[in-house]
C-alpha cells in the first residue's frame, strides 16, 4: 500500500460477528476464529502484541464526536466540534461508485493539535451520507513515532436505505527515530452480511462484551479460505516458514534471549522446542538497598503454565548485609481455570497461600511495582522506620467477564518494628509523651479476614510476567473493601474494622486533553494502635508512581482513622505549548495535577487525648514525634509537569501548599519517569 519493500514479521486474523440490541441497549462481539503467527510467538506473556495493537489502532467511527486512536482522542471531521477545530474546503462534485458526491477536504486549524487532514465524499442528496472518507495525520502533527497514517473507509446503502460501513483500512508507518528503519502496521477490516432480523435473546445473556468460541484457535485452512475476504500475500501465507528460517540464523537465539530478559524482566530456562517451566526474576530486584538491610541481594523465580496448567509456585530468597538476616517468601496457588503461562490471566479464578518473612516499609503496600525494584528504591527521604513482617495469607479471587471481581483474604501477621521505629505503650505519666514508665512493645500480632469488591466494566489489559497492566484507563473503576481484625484468634491481639472505597474515572475533552479523577475514602472504626490506622498513599520515590499518590508526604507523617482524598490530573496534550513559537517544535506536552486529603483522628485513637494503654505513642526520632494529627485544613499539593521531552522523559515539579510549618518537611520537589506514548 505504501509502495515500499515490506518484510512481514507478524500477522493476525480474526473472524467475528457483532450483535446489537437497541432496547435494552446491548452490544456483543462473538469471535468465531482467530489465527496468528509471527514474532510474538517468541514471547510467553499472552497475546500482548495483539491486545496492544487492538487498543492503539482501535476501530474508527467517524460519526462519533471524538475518535479514539493511538490511545488519544482526535476530533472527528463530522463531529460536533469539527467546525471550530477544522478548516473545510469545497473541492468539486464527482461520481463515487455511480453516486454523485460532494468532495470536501479538511485540515486542523493548528497542525500540531490531535486532528486529521483528509477528504470526505458526501452523497449529494437529502441524506448527506458519507460515501467515502480518507483521513491522514498532518506532517507536523504532535503525535510521536508515527511517520504516516492513512485511514480509508467506504460506506454502502443497503436496500432498506440504511447506510453501513463496508471497508475500513488503516496503514500506519512507525519509527522510533528519523532515518532508522521502522515498522508498518496494516489493519484491513471488511464488514458484510448486515442483518436486521430479530436476534435470539439468549445471545445477549452471554457473559462479557467479547465472547470467544471454544474452538476459535483450531479453525482449519479451509475455514480461513472461506471467510477471508482479502487473500494473504505470498509472504504472509508463508509466515511460519519465515519464522523457522530466522531461528536458524547464528546468534539469533541469543538476541531473542536478551530481548526477552530486557522486555519481560525475567530469564527463562527453556526454549521454543522445550518451553520454560521455570523463570528467574524479576531481574531488577536482584540488588537493592534499604536502611535496615543495607545492601540487599535477592533471587526470585516462578513456575509457568508449561509445568502445570493449574498449579503455580513462586518465591524469593534475600539477604541483608547490614542486619545479617535471611528473608524469604513462597506462594503456592491453584488456578481453577487452565492458564497458559501466569496466574493472573483473565479471568482470574484461583486459591493461593503465601508465607513471607521480610523487612517492609509502611508505604510499600501502595507501590504499583515490586518493593525491591531498584528504580523505586531511590528515595527523596530517609526511610528508617520499618518492620520485620511474618505474614501468612490465604487468598481466593474470582473475576467475571463483566468486569466484576471479588477477592477474599485470611491473614495472620506478626509485625516487629525495625530501624528507628519502636512501639511504646501509652502508659506513661502524661498521655502521648514518653518517659521511663512507658512499656516497650516487642511486636504485635493480628488475625484478619478481608473482602474486596471491584467493578471495572470495559477494562482492557495485558499480562506481563510480574503483573497485569492496564492498556487503557478509559474504563471507570469502583472498589469497596472491608477488613476485620479478630482478637483471640490464632494469637490476634486486636479487634478492628477497616472500610475503604474508591472510584476512578477518566474524562476526555476532545483536542483539549483528558482529566483523570480518583476519589478515595476510608475509616478505621475501632480503637487500635497507630500501625493499624489509615496512612496516606505516599510515594517516597523520585519516580512518579500514579495519579493519586502524594509526592511530598513523608513516611507515616499523618495518622488518621477517618480520611477522604481527591486527586485530579489534567493532561492538555500540548494544547498550550503548540501555540508558543519555537517551543511547539519541541512537541512538549503539559500536565497539571492537584491532590488533596482530609483526615482526622478521633479522641479514642489519639494518644494525646486518651490514657488508653492499648494505644501506642506516635513514632519518634531523637525523642520528637515524626507523625502528626491533621487539623481541619486538608493536606494539598499541586504539580506542574512537562512530558514528551525527547519523546521519552516526564518531569514535574511538586509543591506542598498546606502543613508547610511542620519542622523538616519538604515544601517542593522534582519527580520524573520514563514515559513513551504516541
Ranges and model annotations:
Residues 1-101, 107-116, 173, 177-281, ...:
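Structured extracytoplasmic
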Residues 134-138, 278-289, 299-300, 305, ...:
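Transmembrane beta-strand segments that form the barrel wall of outer-membrane beta-barrel proteins
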Residues 146, 180-181, 327-330, 363-370, ...:
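Outer-membrane beta-barrel translocator domains and adjoining extracellular loop/strand segments
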Residues 268-278, 306-311, 337-349, 403-406, ...:
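Short loop/turn motifs that connect adjacent beta-strands in outer-membrane beta-barrel proteins
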Residues 287, 350-368, 375-384, 439, ...:
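C-terminal outer-membrane beta-barrel translocator/porin domains of Gram-negative envelope proteins
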Residues 315-319, 351-359, 408-414, 449, ...:
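Transmembrane beta-barrel strands of outer-membrane/channel proteins
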Amino acid at each position: 500500500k505504501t509502495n515500499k519493500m515490506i518484510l512481514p514479521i507478524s500477522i493476525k486474523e480474526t473472524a467475528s460477528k457483532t450483535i446489537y440490541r437497541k432496547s435494552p441497549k446491548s452490544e456483543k462481539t462473538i469471535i468465531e476464529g482467530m489465527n496468528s503467527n509471527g514474532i510474538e510467538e517468541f514471547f510467553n506473556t499472552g497475546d500482548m502484541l495483539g491486545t496492544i495493537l487492538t487498543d492503539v489502532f482501535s476501530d474508527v467511527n467517524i460519526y462519533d464526536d471524538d475518535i479514539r486512536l493511538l490511545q488519544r482522542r482526535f476530533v472527528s471531521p463530522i463531529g460536533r466540534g469539527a467546525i471550530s477545530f477544522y478548516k473545510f474546503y469545497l473541492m468539486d462534485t464527482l461520481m463515487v461508485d455511480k453516486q454523485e458526491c460532494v468532495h470536501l477536504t479538511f485540515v486542523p486549524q493548528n497542525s500540531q493539535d490531535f486532528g486529521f487532514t483528509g477528504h470526505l465524499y458526501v452523497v449529494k442528496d437529502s441524506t448527506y451520507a458519507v460515501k467515502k472518507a480518507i483521513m491522514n495525520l498532518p506532517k507536523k502533527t504532535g503525535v510521536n513515532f508515527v511517520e504516516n497514517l492513512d485511514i480509508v473507509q467506504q460506506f454502502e446503502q443497503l436496500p432498506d436505505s440504511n447506510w453501513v460501513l463496508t471497508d475500513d483500512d488503516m496503514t500506519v508507518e512507525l519509527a522510533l527515530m528519523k532515518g532508522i528503519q521502522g515498522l508498518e502496521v496494516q489493519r484491513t477490516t471488511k464488514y458484510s452480511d448486515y442483518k436486521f432480523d430479530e436476534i435470539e435473546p439468549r445471545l445477549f445473556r452471554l457473559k462479557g462484551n467479547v465472547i470467544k468460541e471454544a474452538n476459535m484457535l483450531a479453525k482449519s485452512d479451509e475455514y480461513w479460505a472461506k471467510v477471508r475476504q482479502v487473500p494473504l500475500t505470498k509472504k504472509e501465507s508463508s509466515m511460519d516458514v519465515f519464522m523457522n528460517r530466522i531461528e536458524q540464523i547464528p546468534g539469533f537465539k541469543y538476541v531473542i534471549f536478551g530481548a526477552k530478559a530486557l522486555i519481560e524482566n525475567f530469564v527463562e530456562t527453556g526454549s521454543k522446542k522445550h518451553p520454560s517451566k521455570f523463570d528467574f526474576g524479576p531481574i531488577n530486584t536482584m540488588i537493592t538497598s534499604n536502611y535496615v538491610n543495607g545492601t540487599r541481594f535477592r533471587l526470585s523465580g516462578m513456575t509457568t503454565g508449561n509445568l502445570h496448567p493449574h498449579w503455580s509456585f513462586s518465591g524469593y530468597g534475600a539477604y541483608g548485609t547490614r542486619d545479617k538476616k535471611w528473608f524469604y517468601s513462597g506462594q503456592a496457588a491453584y488456578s481453577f481455570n487452565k492458564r497458559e503461562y501466569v496466574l493472573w490471566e483473565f479471568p482470574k479464578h484461583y486459591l493461593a497461600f503465601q508465607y513471607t518473612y521480610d523487612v517492609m516499609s509502611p508505604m510499600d503496600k501502595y507501590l504499583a511495582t515490586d518493593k525491591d525494584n531498584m528504580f523505586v528504591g531511590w528515595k527523596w527521604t530517609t526511610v528508617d522506620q520499618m518492620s520485620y513482617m511474618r505474614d501468612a495469607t490465604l487468598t481466593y479471587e474470582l473475576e467475571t467477564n463483566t468486569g466484576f471481581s471479588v477477592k477474599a483474604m485470611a491473614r495472620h501477621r506478626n509485625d516487629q518494628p525495625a530501624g528507628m521505629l519502636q512501639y511504646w505503650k501509652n502508659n506513661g505519666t502524661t498521655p502521648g509523651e514518653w518517659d521511663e514508665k512507658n512499656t516497650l512493645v516487642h511486636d504485635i500480632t493480628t488475625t484478619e479476614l478481608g473482602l474486596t469488591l471491584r467493578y471495572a466494566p470495559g477494562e482492557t489489559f495485558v499480562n506481563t510476567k510480574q503483573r497485569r497492566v492496564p492498556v487503557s484507563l478509559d474504563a471507570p473503576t469502583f472498589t469497596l473493601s472491608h477488613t476485620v481484625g479478630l482478637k483471640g484468634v490464632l494469637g490476634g491481639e486486636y479487634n478492628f474494622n477497616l472500610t475503604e472505597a474508591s472510584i476512578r474515572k477518566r474524562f476526555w475533552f476532545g483536542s483539549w486533553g483528558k482529566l483523570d479523577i480518583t476519589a478515595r475514602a476510608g475509616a478505621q472504626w475501632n480503637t487500635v494502635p497507630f500501625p493499624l490506622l489509615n496512612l496516606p498513599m505516599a510515594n517516597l520515590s523520585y519516580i512518579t508512581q500514579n495519579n493519586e499518590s502524594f509526592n511530598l508526604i513523608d513516611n507515616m507523617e499523618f495518622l488518621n482513622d477517618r480520611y477522604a482524598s481527591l486527586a485530579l490530573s489534567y493532561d492538555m496534550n500540548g494544547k498550550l505549548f503548540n501555540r508558543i513559537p519555537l517551543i511547539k517544535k519541541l512537541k512538549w506536552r503539559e500536565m497539571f495535577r492537584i491532590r488533596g486529603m482530609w483526615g482526622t483522628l478521633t479522641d479514642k485513637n489519639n494518644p494525646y487525648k486518651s490514657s488508653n494503654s492499648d494505644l501506642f505513642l506516635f513514632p519518634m526520632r531523637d525523642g520528637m514525634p515524626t507523625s502528626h494529627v491533621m487539623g481541619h485544613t486538608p493536606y494539598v499539593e499541586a504539580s506542574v509537569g512537562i512530558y514528551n521531552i525527547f519523546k521519552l522523559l516526564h518531569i514535574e515539579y511538586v509543591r506542598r501548599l498546606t502543613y508547610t510549618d511542620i519542622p523538616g518537611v519538604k515544601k517542593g520537589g522534582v519527580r520524573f519517569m520514563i514515559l513513551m506514548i504516541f
